Amino acid sequence: MARIAGVDIPRNKKIEIAITYIYGIGRSNGMEILRKANVNPERRVRDLTEEEVGRIREIVDREYRVEGDLRREVQLNIKRLMDIGCYRGLRHRRGMPVRGQRTRTNARTRRGRRGQAIGIKKKATKK
């Protein structure tokens, strides 16, 4: 397995797909990285030379914010919104949808299982 930005890249996948296993790199950024590193996107990771992996690793480290740094930045952005008390920060704090979605129904993913109705239970029969 090739290791880029602290992530083990799967050996059997094409490099254009495998590079997206790095948090912060999607399909378009991945293709851009491969173009800059002069690597054919159709090649499998196991077929890459150590030099090609090194070029990809260098480009990712130099030009992109990925993995831990990106996660930390996102968390700090959310914390900043909560600290200044803006509407988006309040929604984050309450665990509600942030981007204007309806909440009378739906929003289950964000809100979790709150106050679900409990079904009627049958009384146990005597034997």
UniProtKB/Swiss-Prot annotation:
Query: Keyword annotations for this protein?
Result: Ribonucleoprotein, Ribosomal protein, RNA-binding, rRNA-binding, tRNA-binding
One GO MF term attached to the UniProt entry: structural constituent of ribosome
Chain residue ranges for the region called Disordered: 93-127
> GO terms for CC?
cytosol; small ribosomal subunit
Question: So what family is this one in?
Answer: Belongs to the universal ribosomal protein uS13 family.
Subunit info here reads:
Part of the 30S ribosomal subunit. Forms a loose heterodimer with protein S19. Forms two bridges to the 50S subunit in the 70S ribosome.
Protein known as: Small ribosomal subunit protein uS13
Q: Which gene encodes it?
A: rpsM
